[in-house]
Amino acid sequence: MKKLIALILAMVMSISMVACGGGEEETPKSTIDKILDKGYITVAISPDFAPSEFKDPISGEVLGTDVEYAKYVAQYISEKYGKTVELKIEEMDFKSCQAAVATGTVDFSVNGYAATAERQENYICAGPYAVVSAENDTYHGALVKKGLKIETAEDFKGLKIGAQQASLQYNLAMEQLPIDEMPEIELITTLPLGAIQVATDKIDALITDSGAAESIIHNNPELEMAAFKFEYSSEGNVALVNLNETELGALITEALVASGDVMDYDTLRNEMAQKAIEMGVEVLG
């Protein structure tokens, strides 16, 4: 009888343990854990702005300063966690890169982003990285046909300008130019196309930086940078991370800040600019 009771008690305890165990829920894995499990991290890049990001016209490989910083992020994560993490590049246009981050389609994006107030409201701005040295004298201004004088913001009245949507240059134009007295800004998908629109009188000016203009002017001698300069002080670039991914954002910030100890932006930019030129790719920044 005692054996029977003991057997029944054992069965009851066993059933109870199974029932309790079945009710437990596993803690969802963090994005970082998922990256470590997959062995790669995804980055959205628009490869149309050499030397920051461009494609080898023969192999199709995406290259550039931003690519090198993204690679360093993957390397940093690998070394920090002791697991191999590779970089997987997702190519798309500039606007789509930001949308991909917002929807969680990619882990992060690098495209020479500035930490604007709007971006800080909608994304984690990880970084900074690629901090420009004091000796670098590039500026943001307007690429125009020779003969068109633009010296002040007021000179833009009545002119049709172009800029990449959601870019720093677009925001500078919206903030510092008399937009209410100008035609609607022409949204440019790529800077090379914007330069063509200036050359063919589709727009009066392309809002860009002087570094981008150097190569464009070299290949299009009828163009020049206007005397006007936007007021802007660079504090480096940032990577965009989904606003809800605070842990991942902190990790990418950690990696990008650390990159400053092992990567010199000015040297890297010159190397990538030379590589782009050798490949016949127009250097735009």
Predicted regions, residues:
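C-terminal motif of bacterial Sec signal peptides marking the signal peptidase cleavage site
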Residues: 16-19
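Ligand-binding clefts/hinges and TM-proximal coupling segments of bilobed small-molecule sensing domains
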Residues: 22-27, 36-37, 168-186, 221-228, ...
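Extended ligand-binding regions for polar small-molecule ligands
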Residues: 25, 72-76, 146-150, 158-160, ...
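Extracytoplasmic small-molecule ligand-binding "clamshell" domains
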Residues: 25-110
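Bilobed "Venus flytrap"/periplasmic-binding protein-like clamshell domains
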Residues: 45, 49-50, 62-79, 114, ...
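Periplasmic-binding protein-like
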Residues: 47, 130-144, 210, 214-256, ...
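Acidic, polar ligand-binding/catalytic clefts
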Residues: 83-155
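A ligand-binding cleft/hinge motif common to bilobed small-molecule-binding domains
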Residues: 96, 110-122, 172-177, 196-200, ...
